[in-house]
Amino acid sequence: MNINGAVALVTGGASGLGLATSEQLLEAGAAVVILDLPGSAGAAVADKLGDRARFSAGDVTSESDVTAALDVAAELGPLRVAVNCAGTGNAIKTVGRDGPFPLDQFTRIVNINLVGTFNVIRLAAHRMAATDPVDGERGVIVNTASVAAFDGQIGQAAYSASKGGIVGMTLPIARDLAAAQIRVVTIAPGLFDTPLLGTLPDEARASLGRQVPHPARLGDPAEYAALVAHIVANPMLNGEVIRLDGAIRMAPR
């Protein structure tokens, strides 16, 4: 899929991995719609990114919000790329000092990370399937899982379950959408220098980076975005989960 001239939807595009992805796709010639929460910096980010960027406020778990973002994308042209970067996490033990893991907190993480991702996939794929193919492809969908899907740490039951679900649905969805000439690939990032880690002291962030075998540092969001661009451009990448983690395997805590 040629990025130049394509229209892309990026969820969570106002910060972190999503922002880097939006910047990368725009630099490669795409038009980008950022879908992020109303309280995010999405409007300011889109304004800064220029004429080919748009912001649509919404929640990935809402069918109407995602549909509205896709309608904004349709104003720019046929949707060709969707990148799921929206997500959240928590750190709660299955049984802690205050009792069992609150079920509403578990379902909240799964709903945003897993159900929200699938909601965007199904609605974006429906739009893509109605477009004319270009060089044998109608679209590319890239999802964001995590190494926590494989190496979940203490307190990550909900987060690991949500990201493991994204890993598990990648291949069947790719098979579902193959007849429509739509590819689906998932990236499982390791430790990246995102706003979430940016709240930690410098020494704590440096210590986390030293846990990565090579390169012994936190990942740069631009490196995630570069992989997204390669996935979009490489027609043989489909149904795969790619760990982007510097060979780290997380310890229990």
PLM features: what roles do these ranges have?
Residues 88, 99-119, 142, 159, ...:
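Catalytic Tyr-X3-Lys loop
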Residues 89-107, 126, 130-135, 155-158, ...:
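Conserved mid-core segment of classical short-chain dehydrogenase/reductases
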Residues 111, 203-223:
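Catalytic Tyr-x(3-8)-Lys segment
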Residues 121, 162, 170:
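Active-site helix of classical SDR
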Residues 126, 174-176:
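Alpha-helical segment proximal to the catalytic Tyr-Lys
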Residues 146:
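Residue(s) in the substrate-gating loop at a strand-loop-helix junction
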Residues 178, 183, 237-240:
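Short, small/polar-rich loop/turn modules that mediate ligand/substrate recognition or access, typified
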Residues 220-244, 249:
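C-terminal substrate-recognition "lid" of short-chain dehydrogenase/reductases
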